[in-house]
Amino acid sequence: MMKIIAFVGMPASGKSEASRIAAEMDIPVIIMGDVIRKEVLKRGLEPNDSNTGMVATDLRKCEGMDAVARRCVSQIRETGSELVVVDGVRGIAEVECFRQEFGKGFILISIYAPLEVRFSRVQKRGRSDDMNSIDGLRQRDERELSWGMGEAIEASNVEIENSFTLETFRKDVNDVLNNYLKSNSEK
């Protein structure tokens, strides 16, 4: 049975870092935000937070709240891997889409970090779609919560706290991923 481990969490909580750890373990990673970023460029827009948010909202409005997840399903299957990591679930409709597609093979891991910790990370990472104030981060939180992010976080199988050092977080993610890798090889 194919296993999908998906990371959910508020912006800058550590989803991308968790996915990097998976990639270092040779687990294929599908980044849901890449679907949005690709659509932003396809529409000829500047890849900033405002346009990224507008396109993400528009896709969900026109194609359904699970639009991004549905676009990722074929990418997941194309990996041909028994275990795939999905970075960036944003709402309960996406969780339901993946659960319908992959059944018990779908595992949702929420990553938690407080607002102030997340904002300090945003300031350091310098992505084009990042916000430049704590109020901007709050607005992005509200936008993502309006997509059902809170319900998706509540639906997670496991929570990893990311309020401490990077080393602690990496160890926690490694432990969780190794647990699922081990259970995948024991079938």
Curated annotation (Swiss-Prot):
Belongs to the UPF0200 family. Keywords: ATP-binding, Nucleotide-binding. InterPro entries: NTP_hydrolase-rel, P-loop_NTPase. One of its GO terms (molecular function) is ATP binding. Gene3D superfamilies: P-loop containing nucleotide triphosphate hydrolases. It comes from Methanosarcina acetivorans (strain ATCC 35395 / DSM 2834 / JCM 12185 / C2A). This is UPF0200 protein MA_4660. The keyword ATP-binding applies. Pfam families: AAA_17. ATP binds at G9, M10, P11, A12, S13, G14, K15, S16. The keyword ATP-binding applies. Signal peptide: none annotated.
